[in-house]
From Swiss-Prot:
Coiled-coil stretches: none
Gene: pfd-4
InterPro entries: PFD_beta-like (IPR002777), PFDN4 (IPR016661)
GO cellular component, one term: prefoldin complex
Alphabetically ordered keywords of this record: Chaperone
Gene Ontology MF terms in the entry: unfolded protein binding
Pfam families: Prefoldin_2
Record's protein name: Probable prefoldin subunit 4
Recorded superkingdom: Eukaryota
Cited PANTHER family: PREFOLDIN SUBUNIT 4 (PTHR21100:SF9)
Family: Belongs to the prefoldin subunit beta family.
A single BP term in Gene Ontology: protein folding
Record text on subunit structure and interactions: Heterohexamer of two PFD-alpha type and four PFD-beta type subunits.
Annotated function: Binds specifically to cytosolic chaperonin (c-CPN) and transfers target proteins to it. Binds to nascent polypeptide chain and promotes folding in an environment in which there are many competing pathways for nonnative proteins.
Amino acid sequence: MPEHTKVSAEDQALLNKFARSYQTQTQLKADVKEAKTLIDNINEASDEILLLDDEDSASIPCRIGSCFVHFNGDSLNEHLEGKKTTAEKVLSEKTSELDAISADMEQIKKVLYAKFGDQINLDAEE
């Protein structure tokens, strides 16, 4: 029977930190995906506005919250550019956070695998 390594309080703290980081990483991945989707949707909407003729672009409904506001083509493009800039900033921040937490998790994994070897599994099942 293989000998089991004792888990110290420091080891338990590292395991707990890894678990919290994993949850944060999962949420950040979802946030990054959401921001990318929003940017893609804004780009698609901007492209569609360019295809409209002058008559159709005089009053374009845009959902803001739970209601629709009518914009002309130029003001809607400005509105979309503002939203895109905000979404790109959020994407950049979330990506940086994700990279930092992933690097931290890799360091924790190295320490824990060095001590426990194959007695633990810290790799995500995807």
